[in-house]
């Protein structure tokens, strides 16, 4: 039997990779509605994500760019708080700017999850 947390991690990563694979930048930046969470380029050229003050359906649907940013944000914060100095802030996590960069940052985060993988244990057969 495999370690349940390890199996969940592997499944989550496989699903993420599957959905990121054919993603285009145009799809990421497409807005499904006039209101909703999205990313915006700041004066320094960095892509910043909207951050809602509250949750609710009236906020509108998020763009794919925002969803990919949020995945990156969640994993970055989790790794920093669990295995790093715990000093990372939301403002320091930016959207990478393209679908190719989303895939690259996801791969980088997966490699950065080695401490997480070590903590949940090796795959058992």
Regions found by a protein language model. Name each.
Residues 1-5, 34-58, 62, 68-125:
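Short, helix-capping/interhelical loops that line the mouth of catalytic, cofactor-
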Residues 14-47:
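Low-complexity, Ser/Thr/Pro/Gly-enriched N-terminal "stalk/linker" regions
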